[in-house]
Amino acid sequence: MGQASIQRRAGRPRRTATAAVRASQPVCHLCGLPVDLTLQRTGRGKHPLSSCIDEIIPVIRGGSITDPANLGHAHSVCNN
């Protein structure tokens, strides 16, 4: 099992880091516009401006998914 597989199963530490990033970073780190936390999934998937968490340094390149310093708050559309 690779490092990416192991880290993706981080569970609670990942959720804790994600919650911290959403609370402390109210703007998209990619475009600089505010992220509306009330936008949720629609019947056909995510709203384009809904919240997602982006790995600044991908796990495959040694980044951590449990370190808030490596996570950025983004719009779904900006992160794709």
Predicted region positions:
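Cys/His/Pro-rich metal-binding microdomains
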Residues: 29, 72, 76
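Short, charged surface segments at domain edges that flank catalytic/cofactor-binding sites
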Residues: 1-40
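Short, intrinsically disordered, charge-balanced linker/junction segments flanking boundaries
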Residues: 78-80
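Histidine-centered nuclease catalytic patch
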Residues: 34-72
